[in-house]
Regions:
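Short, Lys/Arg-enriched N-terminal segments with co-localized hydrophobic residues
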Residues: 1-9
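Alpha-helical substrate-recognition element adjacent to the catalytic core
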Residues: 11-122, 126-127
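Short amphipathic alpha-helix with an adjacent loop that forms part of the alpha/beta core around
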Residues: 203-209
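Short, well-ordered alpha-helical microsegments
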Residues: 103-107, 165-166, 201
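Short, acidic/turn-prone active-site loops that include or flank metal/cofactor-
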Residues: 120-125, 180-184, 198-200
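Acidic, Mg2+-coordinating phosphoryl-transfer loop and its flanking beta/alpha structural elements
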Residues: 95-100, 154-195
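Substrate-recognition "cap/lid" segment bordering the active-site pocket of phosphatases
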Residues: 104-156, 187
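Alpha-helical segments flanking ligand/cofactor-binding loops in enzyme cores
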Residues: 87, 147, 166-167
Length: 209
């Protein structure tokens, strides 16, 4: 039959990863490796580029290459209920995880989540396993990705917990804060905020009606 314009809407759900599905990887890594300095996040150093270079310096100082880091990350589990939430969500929506982390760090956690689609960044790794640098896929990757998906005919639904999720949340047809901070919730009272996966599932389902 002929494709009537605007009759069917195709949705894609875009989710932040850290704080939503898995713990903050660097904080969990700092605890598991016993290197407390690595707990520093973008809240302490807003310049992500600077923060990452500083982190890589600390790893080098401690002689930690990618293999050692991945072995530590393998001990980190997704947040309780995250896998079930994703499995259920993917029964009725296409889902893309969008994160500022790196494919190589996220790999052990993606395995535990059933290998969802993840858009993130890449590390530069030397033959001996030393992490020598990193490549950010694109500036403002969350907002850029949502806009790109909209340009190919998708309506997006987005959820995340932090400041760098606000762009994609505000640009989407529906957007939700999940386990966010009191400050962000107070500053953006117009964005519905949820704490539990079943609430978020219901909100996403309702947004697709």
């Amino acid at each position: 039959g002929s494709a009537g314009k605007g009759i069917i809407t195709m949705y894609i759900t875009c989710l932040d990863v850290e704080g939503v599905l898995v713990p903050e990887i660097w904080i969990a890594f700092a605890e598991a490796s016993g290197i407390p300095e690595l707990k520093k996040t973008t809240r302490d150093e807003p310049d992500y580029d600077k923060l990452m270079r500083w982190r890589l310096g600390i790893l080098k100082e401690h002689g930690l290459g990618l293999k050692e880091i991945q072995a530590t990350i393998e001990k980190i589990d997704p947040l309780p209920g995250a896998r079930e939430f994703l499995d259920e969500l993917r029964t009725f929506s296409q889902v893309i995880l969008i994160s500022d982390t790196f494919t190589e760090f996220a790999a052990p956690l993606m395995k535990k989540l059933g290998y969802p689609t993840l858009f993130c960044n890449s590390l530069e790794v030397a033959d001996d396993g030393e992490i020598t640098g990193f490549k950010m896929r694109v500036e403002q990757s969350k907002l850029t990705t949502v806009k790109a998906l909209q340009s190919i005919g998708f309506e997006t639904i987005a959820s995340g917990d932090s400041y760098n999720d606000l762009g994609m949340i505000q640009a989407s047809k529906a957007g939700f804060l999940f386990r966010s901070t009191d400050k962000i919730k107070a500053d953006y009272p117009e964005i519905p905020a949820y704490e539990e996966y079943d609430e978020l599932l219901t909100a996403i389902r309702n947004a697709m009606k």
